[in-house]
């Protein structure tokens, strides 16, 4: 689950303007909108929502949200109309505020996946910062472009600031034990009697490798395939190809499973034949056990002779399973 606000389970994304003339310095700015209700109509691909506030009657700030159909990426643009006789200066900020509560989807069948903040720098393309790391110390770094987000098993929320500016990224905890991953942009300056704007983006949705790669460099690294990445990556590619034809993710997963089953049909057949053979000779094996009792050497030799006579490999049911196991671990 993404973005909620309840007792002990705050997961909130916020953005605004701080600094010299920032309107969010002493608290959240109050905006007004033209309409009370906005809806993306049928046939409409883009929805624009403008929130407007005035500062001392000579500066107007419009916070423009742009939503696109079938997209989890939101454009947020700050448009400043400076009708004063002085330069207007501020910094754009974006933050994710989250309490330390577990994500049920972060516990998979083969271990706990990463739950925490993620970011990138020029020197390190993918940095993971969990709650314990923030408890130890706050961290801050500057980089050109970049992004900062919060990662859980299947989903990601991330702020992507202006990619041409130098931005500062910080992870910290406040006195109320709330955890923050945030950025502050470089100077946003609007000259006297002029208009200026700055755009940022916010993504909140599933971890789609190809979508994330197009949004910002290294954002696709938030998909942690683990030590079986060499299997997971092609499986995901195949899944996206099937989904592009079918158009239904649930059906695509079923078809992918059938494809994998078909690829391993011969191995599965060998496994089932071996298991059937073992069941068939069970009475004879019991007779051997009764005959040799505590004579382990005799029991072992007679058992191996039986396997050879019946042409059965006792490991025939296990080896195909071991070969298939890594692949099905990646399908979980």
Language-model segments: what does each one mean?
Residues 78, 90-111, 151, 179, ...:
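Helix-loop-helix
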Residues 1-221:
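Soluble non-transmembrane domains of integral membrane proteins
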């Amino acid at each position: 689950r993404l973005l909620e606000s309840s007792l002990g389970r705050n997961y909130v994304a916020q953005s605004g303007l701080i600094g010299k003339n920032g309107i969010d310095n002493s608290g959240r700015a109050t905006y007004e909108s033209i309409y009370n209700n906005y809806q993306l109509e049928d046939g409409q691909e883009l929805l624009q929502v403008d929130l407007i506030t005035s500062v001392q009657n000579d500066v107007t700030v419009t916070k423009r949200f742009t939503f696109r159909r079938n997209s989890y990426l939101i454009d947020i643009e700050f448009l400043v109309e400076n009708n004063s006789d002085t330069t207007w200066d501020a910094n754009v900020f974006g933050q994710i505020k989250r309490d330390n509560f577990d994500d049920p989807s972060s516990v998979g069948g083969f271990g706990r996946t990463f739950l925490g903040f993620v970011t990138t720098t020029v020197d390190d393309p993918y940095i993971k910062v969990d709650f314990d790391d923030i408890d130890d110390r706050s961290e801050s770094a500057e980089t050109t472009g970049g992004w900062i987000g919060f990662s859980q098993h299947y989903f990601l929320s991330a702020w992507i600031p202006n990619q041409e500016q130098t931005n500062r990224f910080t992870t910290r905890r406040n006195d109320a034990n709330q955890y923050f991953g945030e950025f502050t942009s470089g100077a946003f300056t609007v000259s006297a009697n002029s208009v200026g704007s700055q755009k940022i983006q916010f993504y909140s949705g599933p971890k789609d490798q190809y979508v994330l790669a197009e949004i910002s460099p290294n954002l696709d690294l938030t998909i942690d395939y683990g030590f079986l990445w060499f299997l997971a990556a092609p499986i995901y590619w195949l899944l996206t190809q099937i989904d592009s034809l079918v158009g239904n993710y649930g059906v695509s997963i079923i078809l992918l499973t059938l494809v994998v089953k078909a690829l391993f049909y011969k191995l599965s057949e060998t496994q089932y034949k071996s298991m059937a053979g073992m069941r068939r000779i069970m009475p004879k094996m019991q007779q051997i056990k009764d005959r040799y009792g505590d004579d382990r050497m005799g029991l072992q030799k007679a058992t191996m002779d039986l396997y050879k006579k019946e042409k059965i490999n006792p490991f025939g049911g296990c080896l195909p399973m071991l070969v298939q196991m890594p692949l099905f671990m990646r399908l979980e």
